[in-house]
Amino acid sequence: MIERGKFRSLTLINWNGFFARTFDLDELVTTLSGGNGAGKSTTMAAFVTALIPDLTLLHFRNTTEAGATSGSRDKGLHGKLKAGVCYSMLDTINSRHQRVVVGVRLQQVAGRDRKVDIKPFAIQGLPMSVQPTQLVTETLNERQARVLPLNELKDKLEAMEGVQFKQFNSITDYHSLMFDLGIIARRLRSASDRSKFYRLIEASLYGGISSAITRSLRDYLLPENSGVRKAFQDMEAALRENRMTLEAIRVTQSDRDLFKHLISEATNYVAADYMRHANERRVHLDKALEFRRELHTSRQQLAAEQYKHVDMARELAEHNGAEGDLEADYQAASDHLNLVQTALRQQEKIERYEADLDELQIRLEEQNEVVAEAIERQQENEARAEAAELEVDELKSQLADYQQALDVQQTRAIQYNQAIAALNRAKELCHLPDLTADCAAEWLETFQAKELEATEKMLSLEQKMSMAQTAHSQFEQAYQLVVAINGPLARNEAWDVARELLREGVDQRHLAEQVQPLRMRLSELEQRLREQQEAERLLADFCKRQGKNFDIDELEALHQELEARIASLSDSVSNAREERMALRQEQEQLQSRIQSLMQRAPVWLAAQNSLNQLSEQCGEEFTSSQDVTEYLQQLLEREREAIVERDEVGARKNAVDEEIERLSQPGGSEDQRLNALAERFGGVLLSEIYDDVSLEDAPYFSALYGPSRHAIVVPDLSQVTEHLEGLTDCPEDLYLIEGDPQSFDDSVFSVDELEKAVVVKIADRQWRYSRFPEVPLFGRAARESRIESLHAEREVLSERFATLSFDVQKTQRLHQAFSRFIGSHLAVAFESDPEAEIRQLNSRRVELERALSNHENDNQQQRIQFEQAKEGVTALNRILPRLNLLADDSLADRVDEIRERLDEAQEAARFVQQFGNQLAKLEPIVSVLQSDPEQFEQLKEDYAYSQQMQRDARQQAFALTEVVQRRAHFSYSDSAEMLSGNSDLNEKLRERLEQAEAERTRAREALRGHAAQLSQYNQVLASLKSSYDTKKELLNDLQRELQDIGVRADSGAEERARIRRDELHAQLSNNRSRRNQLEKALTFCEAEMDNLTRKLRKLERDYFEMREQVVTAKAGWCAVMRMVKDNGVERRLHRRELAYLSADDLRSMSDKALGALRLAVADNEHLRDVLRMSEDPKRPERKIQFFVAVYQHLRERIRQDIIRTDDPVEAIEQMEIELSRLTEELTSREQKLAISSRSVANIIRKTIQREQNRIRMLNQGLQNVSFGQVNSVRLNVNVRETHAMLLDVLSEQHEQHQDLFNSNRLTFSEALAKLYQRLNPQIDMGQRTPQTIGEELLDYRNYLEMEVEVNRGSDGWLRAESGALSTGEAIGTGMSILVMVVQSWEDESRRLRGKDISPCRLLFLDEAARLDARSIATLFELCERLQMQLIIAAPENISPEKGTTYKLVRKVFQNTEHVHVVGLRGFAPQLPETLPGTDEAPSQAS
């Protein structure tokens, strides 16, 4: 027999009053005796804390707080602990003799909430010799010890060999270990289970009949029939899911057209926009590539134009430079012509002026002679006039003197003044400041002598002048001629220079005679030189255009080569034209073929899509129409085979369903009639009696009873006989066994057990041999096992049936799809791929375009080469006639030589022309230059000086004469002399004076006439001189100008200059013409460059805009593609046939679909908002989001248990296949799942009956319990009247309420609740829902009422209530009920725990003073009978005779409070024996 586990000891560490105390627990009763505050409740609290370490439940209160709803803030635990680490440990030994120490580490948490920290732990494998206090304390000295923290305790235990230490983070794990090791009776899986356990302990602790326990006895004693509840829940869940699925199918059927419409329009809306963007992206890419090609071509053209522009600009610059030179040359030639013409005119002027000068020279010489004669006559007239003047003056003086004498007094002063004036004038003229009237006579003689001397000298010089005049005139003429020819020179050098000039003149005349021949020769050579230079220019230009330098000898061969090249290029150009026409014709044919293929491509793509769908659906590849027709025949055969297999699987599934239904009957009856017969006979089915048989024992009992497994056990067979008469509604073989259903055993047979078989000796002459069945069905566990296997098989069959049904309908739809394909697309599906051909043709078209472009480039190059060759030939035609000139290298030297000789000759001609006349004049008179006559100029100066001296001497003598004459007047300073003489003298003087004045007048008249004539002569001479000088100066200027002109004004110079000018003009005109051509070409080139630049700019802008648009679109397109691929909708959106529609058609298609979608999603707010957002043309990804949202919406609407795909399109295709099949299957499944109301009533009744039997068995254990007036205690289990009525209606009158159970809107639980409300309208259901009420009605415990009854004295059986029992009786009754609860838990948990473990049993009782000695003895007896341990807290006057008693006394020693404990074992006549180790000295925690 298995020994029951026991609690060995309780250890308290650092509790209030207990520093390290171990209480050894008795195998039956341990009594804690002591006064108030001794520590009894603290000890029990430590035990309970170690047993249930849940702070949410622990609440230690005094018995006076038994009815209180709240105690102290710390619920009694914080105050029972001391500061620091505390422990409460239970030392146990289980049925396996394993020592297990479980406990908790407690520690106060600082704070006003007075919390406690609890850590549960367990120790296994601890040797028996080790005491718990030794584990958690460390002795410091004889009087002090230290409590080890939990981590040190762990380290200490890990150091011990074979000892296991476990620390738990959850109370559930802690209790799970305690349950597995047999410390507690029930597995506490949840807080609710812990609460029940705690309430049980609390009820036993405080004693009496706990109202909490009494009210919830059903929860404590009646196990939860989780299997039945789970079955009902599974059934309802399956029904609910089935109905939801059916409803979903109905909704799906109603929404199928909406789905199709929504998917179709959404696909059209998004796919059209998707393909439009794809087409636009392709178009944009093509445009970008085209722009890039055009940009590259334009750049090449611009570069070519720029090179051309540079060449033309360079040529234009050369022509501009040459034009400048030519203009300069032309202007120089024109200027030279003008200079020649000017020089000729100047030469004519010079000749004319020279003739005039010769004439003027003659006239000037003649006028000089006339002037000289006039001067002589003028001098004579001046002398006569002066003599006449002197005579007049003398006569006037005489007359004045005479008058003065006449009137001295009047004239004396005047005379005196005149004398003074004459004296002053004489002083001034004679330079004699000391001159006086007295010495005037002396000075007069002197000055008269000087006058005479000067006059003589002047006359002598005049004579000399007359003689040298003639010789001086010839010398001056010759000298002037030499000076005019040679320039200024000394007079003594004139002779040598004149001879040299004459000799040079002869040489110059000889050279001047060669000017005309040299000029003609030079003109001819210059013409040849110009032609040579033109040829060299043409050759240089030709070499530059050819890009190569050629020798003169190579030009003829080059000319022939260029002519041959021209002929060849001409043939190539004509052939290229034909080739270009052929290429263009092929290009047009390709374009036409591409257009026809693009028209055929959508039809072919639609056929290919249909073919691909067929290939995907059937997993085959079709290469021809024959393959399609052959596969269609195979499809028909496969359809027939699948239908046959489906029917077979369906039959097997129905058989399994029937077997499951049969095995699911309550009580294990395979025939419903047996249940009715058992109720009719008042018996019990044998299968119900053995319903709890284990799965291991099921084969044995099944073989033991054999065919009588389904027998009915009745108490008395004789009472059944009358019922057997006329019995027809029964199985063919009905077995009846007599026996007590409450104590039935298998002793009715004599059995011999064999290997996997039994031999049953039914009678002496009848044995039955039965083997153990492979699949036993005897007992609930066996049936459940079989049902589980059948359910698994049914699931497989159902899945296979569904798969086959789906395959059949899929095959049928595939057959329809093949038929549609054959009718619509078979004709074009297996034709060649037009898109592949289009790609090939496009590739060929690109090649043709590239060939055309290359051909155009080659043709252009050939044309350029042809033009270059023609230009080269033209240039060579101009160069070849001048090859001899190009070969003449000495021509320039000869021209320079002739030009030098011509310059010398022209210089000589100019010399002769300029100085020929002077040389001719000089030649006859050159000899006068050999000797120079007197210095004629000096002589002239001496003569003029003598004349001046003579005049000065004459004036001085006249002034002195006047002074001398007025010498007398100086004496008349005071008065005037008296007038002397007579009147006659006066008259004579007057007459003579008149004559003298007349003569003087005549002389003056003659002098004035001669002076005027001389003045005229002088004027004529001056005019002639001025004219001569002017003309001479003009002539000199003209000669200088002619020299400055620097040209030779001969007869042929003008003609040569004009020819040169005309040639340069022609060259300038040609140059200007070429320059104009180049300027026009350059302007055109610049315009072309500007156009190309603008085009290039526009192309660059368009290209970059397009590239940016492509890049931007690429980012958006990548997002779209990523979204499409992530959501797996590319196959739906990338409809290749739409690629051949225009953007307008696609936009129109998308807009039409958008209008339809707006109506379709008008009632769906989410899709409406997403659709509205998707209308943004700049955000194409939003259309994909809308499409995904539509798919997601459809996925949510389509149940995945109905349709096996995530694709709504495929779901719609599968939907039509699945809907009808699922509807039938689910309808039948609902009928099978829906358990009948009678079955529910039978299940609940059988469960109630079984539990009633179990309670009866528990009551048998309490029959012998008695204390006080209580003779016995029992539990009474009754069915509530309202629920009994419900069971009767469910089993007998359920047809009246089928409106509830057949309603698809109500679950079975709700229908059950509605029926309960219908039967009991007086009951208020409150706020509970019908589902909650129905679930409660499916729990059999709610059908039962349990109450405790006691057999007390003469009153018989009474309901146990606190008011009807004494305190001791109430405590005993409550303890009995608690023991029953523990027994019930053990029975319930036996199958969950190992069979070799019997759990510990321990209860508490605080304040046992309320019991008398007999009641306590009864408790001892109860504990002994039930192998239960009990801890009692009692006052000091209680001394049980049995068990272990601890005397607790609380003492204070040196301010330290501790509990003194003395333990006693038993209570006999002998002296009490002190238990070892119970004395504890006061200890102080270190």
From Swiss-Prot:
It comes from Escherichia coli (strain K12). Its main location: cytoplasm. This is Chromosome partition protein MukB. GO terms for molecular function: ATP binding; ATP hydrolysis activity; DNA binding; GTP binding; identical protein binding. Transmembrane segments: none annotated. Residues 645-804 are annotated as: Sufficient for ParC binding. Residues 326-418, 444-480, 509-603, 835-923, 977-1115, 1209-1266 form a coiled coil. It comes from the Bacteria. Gene3D superfamilies: 1.20.58.850, 3.40.1140.10, Immunoglobulin FC, subunit C, MukB, hinge domain. The keyword Cell division applies. Belongs to the SMC family. MukB subfamily. Pfam families: MukB, MukB_hinge, SbcC_Walker_B. Residues 666-783 are annotated as: Flexible hinge. PANTHER family: CHROMOSOME PARTITION PROTEIN MUKB, DUF4476 DOMAIN-CONTAINING PROTEIN. It is found in: Cytoplasm, Nucleoid. InterPro entries: MukB, MukB/SMC, MukB_hinge, MukB_hinge_sf, MukB_N_dom, P-loop_NTPase.
